[in-house]
């Protein structure tokens, strides 16, 4: 039995076609972006960025995880990220913030995230999710 969804399987098959040279070039490009973001944060004296996790609410059901545009850059750069659930909409679908820290400053990110949770007075989000 195939355990992958069609899109996941297609993505994996495309990945297998990438040559070692192409992979090295992609990784080099990712490293350039990592270095740029690190320098930008340092030069701008930015301890953390706050951004929505997604441009919209979470999708209903388990067919998709939703829109990844708001967090793919952090995956590419390897920056540490903490996601803070901040509420649910009228359909009981969650929305969240992501707090993005700097390289090697995970402890500072934890402190900043705790401060944000306390400032926003976020308690446990009430929901009626049934994952069964």
Roles of regions detected by a PLM:
Residues 1-38, 85-96:
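Short helix-loop capping/hinge segments that flank enzyme active sites or metal/cofactor-binding pockets
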Residues 24, 62-63, 76-132:
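Structural helix-boundary/capping segments
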Residues 36-39, 69-71:
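Generic recognition of flexible, low-complexity loop/linker segments
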Residues 47:
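Conserved acidic residues
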Residues 1, 34, 41, 116-120, ...:
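Structural signal for hydrophobic packing residues in well-ordered secondary-structure cores
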Residues 44, 54-72:
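Short, surface-exposed loop/helix-turn segments at secondary-structure junctions
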């Amino acid at each position: 039995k195939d355990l992958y969804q069609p899109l996941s399987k297609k993505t994996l098959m495309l990945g297998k076609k990438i040559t070692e040279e192409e992979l090295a070039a992609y990784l080099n490009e990712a490293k350039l972006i990592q270095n740029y973001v690190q320098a930008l944060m340092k030069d701008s004296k930015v301890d953390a960025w706050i951004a929505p996790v997604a441009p919209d609410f979470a999708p209903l059901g388990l067919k998709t995880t939703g829109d990844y545009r708001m967090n793919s850059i952090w995956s590419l750069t390897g920056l540490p990220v903490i996601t803070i659930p901040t509420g649910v909409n009228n359909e009981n679908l969650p929305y969240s913030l992501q707090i993005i820290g700097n390289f090697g400053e995970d402890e500072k990110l934890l402190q900043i995230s705790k401060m944000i949770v306390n400032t926003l007075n976020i308690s446990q989000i009430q929901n009626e999710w049934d994952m069964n």
